[in-house]
């Protein structure tokens, strides 16, 4: 580790003292206030702001009584226990990324249940995000409109000039409509209800990283895969890369593979960079010309000077003052998000509090977010930004906002597109709740095939979408049941329910992806490892391991890496038995015993379930071992078996709905 030798003022002396103190005690980096970062709020401050913005609690008069009453409304909306208290689950919900429209009626957004009085709606894209190329943005918006035109008579036509019914733009913080954004995460976008003027307009926060939901979308130039997309992670010379790299080159240009294995396929292209091309402007895509002159000053890199929107640009000739030729600088593979660097790329290595960092770090933060400096020394320049993550799906967020632009309000159904909290869904389908809502406004799409109606005469067949399950209205066969961090979770498709009381009614449904992103929409089994309190999920022939809500690096992995034979293509259930701390994995009529300490399967297995677990059926749905209870529970269809751990005897057979779900 290296520190600067010259420190001209008190702050830098303080940095040395902090550095020496940390080195002596081997303590973690101190938490600091980053310039341009939003000030962390107390739970009470967060709640007052949240309830004011989304539930109408008066900002200056949200006293304890009003706060408690409004909190109950918010908790009811999200399927949480209606305590009126600021418990951990409520705070976690408030911190999740979401739409900026309110959850209760707000006449600035939705006056008098508005709708368009015509079926042909125009839209215009005024501005673009630098996170995606224009073609990808155009396609995302077109697909988002198609979500609604597929189930209604509405038809959407794009225009390039003049006033459209729906004007689409990106902006930061205060962007001209009186409803400012809030920086990275938090509030993602908002839209106004149908009507003249600002009615229908949809705005997206450009401090977010806009992707298609699975990380940066990088379209390459040149190479032998021109126009294709980077595939992250990819392998090159036996090493895994999660972003563009200059490895193997001596010209400094960043590149990526467009397949998972460059060593095998040899497909590559160059990642966006201002030395290769620019976007927009009037420079016809020409690369930046460095240095270039602007207002008499010389610039040797992209700048935001002369602009109020924070977008980086450059001259495409050596003299902008003379030629007036310019373009916007494309986001590079390591462009920062948020912070105060205006999208400038990370610079590695960089110095922070005297230490050298060769990659993104969470040092100095208490929220775990990864960041980097955009110069070689944060200590000198204090320029920084967040490192790219999975980002937010522009298609999904736009489809939600365009629902508002059609007149829909937020839905309490967590499986609905119109639910306020953002959740990435890989294979998206419009829910029945969304379809019902939009068709109440605009009737059924004329393209829907006619069929028998509810009355004696013919009528349109309603469009069907996935329905969110209700515990006591449907006989649910659960995909998995597990105790994780002291709570019992019940999983069904992409939904879950949770409770701390084994005999109390669980809260939910909640979307699994809001807690454990990157899982498939249906799991086969789940358990918590007692060694490290990691949650382990199984689906098909793979498994996922999570620390809290973060997927561990290198996952998912194949079942064979656990020691299961290749013929096991899925498992039925898994649990860790408190009696011996071993994990038992069930598939069909067999089970395996896994040693968590040694991280290996025990040689004595597999065995037949019937030979060791008297009375336990084959093809289980789930197994739950309750901590310190002395019992294990086996779930099959609508019933469960309670086994006493000490005697291995089944002591009870009961109905899941009445004994576990409070029905």
Curated annotation (Swiss-Prot):
Segments of this protein annotated with the region Collagenase-like 1: 107-218
Residues binding Zn(2+) 1: 99, 400, 404, 410
InterPro entries hit by this protein: FN_type2_dom (IPR000562), FN_type2_sf (IPR036943), Hemopexin-like_dom (IPR000585), Hemopexin-like_dom_sf (IPR036375), Hemopexin-like_repeat (IPR018487), Hemopexin_CS (IPR018486), Kringle-like (IPR013806), M10A_MMP (IPR033739)
Compartments, as annotated in UniProt: Secreted, Extracellular space, Extracellular matrix
Primary enzyme class: hydrolase
Region (Collagen-binding): 219-393
UniProt entry keywords in alphabetical sequence: Calcium, Collagen degradation, Disulfide bond, Extracellular matrix, Hydrolase, Metal-binding, Metalloprotease, Protease, Repeat, Secreted, Signal, Zinc, Zymogen
Essential cofactor(s): Ca(2+); Zn(2+)
GO biological process: one example: endodermal cell differentiation
Organism from which the protein derives: Gallus gallus (Chicken)
Residues that, per the record, bind Ca(2+) 2: 165, 197, 199, 201
Chain residue ranges for the region called Collagenase-like 2: 394-468
Cellular component per GO, a single term: plasma membrane
Family membership: Belongs to the peptidase M10A family.
Chain ranges of the Fibronectin type-II domain: 225-273, 283-331, 341-389
Protein name: 72 kDa type IV collagenase
One matching Pfam family: fn2
Signal sequence range: 1-26
UniProt PTM: The propeptide is processed by MMP14 (MT-MMP1) and MMP16 (MT-MMP3).
UniProt EC number: 3.4.24.24
